From Swiss-Prot:
This is Hypoxanthine-guanine phosphoribosyltransferase. Its cofactor is Mg(2+). The lineage of its organism: Bacteria, Bacillati, Mycoplasmatota, Mycoplasmoidales, Mycoplasmoidaceae. Mg(2+) binds at E96, D97. PANTHER family: HYPOXANTHINE PHOSPHORIBOSYLTRANSFERASE, HYPOXANTHINE-GUANINE PHOSPHORIBOSYLTRANSFERASE. The active site is at D100. Pathway: Purine metabolism; IMP biosynthesis via salvage pathway; IMP from hypoxanthine: step 1/1; Purine metabolism; GMP biosynthesis via salvage pathway; GMP from guanine: step 1/1. Belongs to the purine/pyrimidine phosphoribosyltransferase family. GO terms for biological process: GMP salvage; guanine salvage; hypoxanthine metabolic process; IMP salvage; purine ribonucleoside salvage. Its EC number is 2.4.2.8. It is found in: Cytoplasm. Keywords: Cytoplasm, Glycosyltransferase, Magnesium, Metal-binding, Nucleotide-binding, Purine salvage, Transferase. Diphosphate binds at K40, G41, R162. One of its GO terms (molecular function) is magnesium ion binding.
Amino acid sequence: MGIKSIIIDQKQVEAGCNAALKWCNEHFAGKQVIVLGILKGCIPFLGKLISQFTFDLQLDFVAVASYHGGSRQQEAPKIVLDMSHDPKGKDILLIEDIVDSGRSIKLVLDLLHTRKAKSVILVSFIEKLKPREADIKVDYSCFKNQDEFLVGFGLDYQGFYRNLPYVGVFDPEDN
């Protein structure tokens, strides 16, 4: 299957999601928030959180494309599905599966800034620790990783493996 090792098992996934949930509920207590998921990878993470958020929210999505079948970004990211709610004057909770180079997130952050969002908080399931191409701040991450190619729990290779209930190190040469 190409998975060399499991680095975040199902119990760790649950614990990470629960910790993120607690952090978000404390941070956004008493606020009305637009929860903005970045498709497609956010689905498992956001799915674990959404029904247990204790603050008032509107749910929205944005999709950014920059990978085309490979394991590395191949072109400048672009918005391929825009959000439907107006972020002007609103608090935004941005949910992402992984922050890697930062280029895709920077595009979304710039869009929200241009549209005059009141505040933007970025919560990522995994944050890569390698130097980023874009200068962005992750406000909360469940897990940190150096620079391994990961699949599972929303992370994919050519559209596959997002459904795995764990996160594994992937070797595309062994697929």
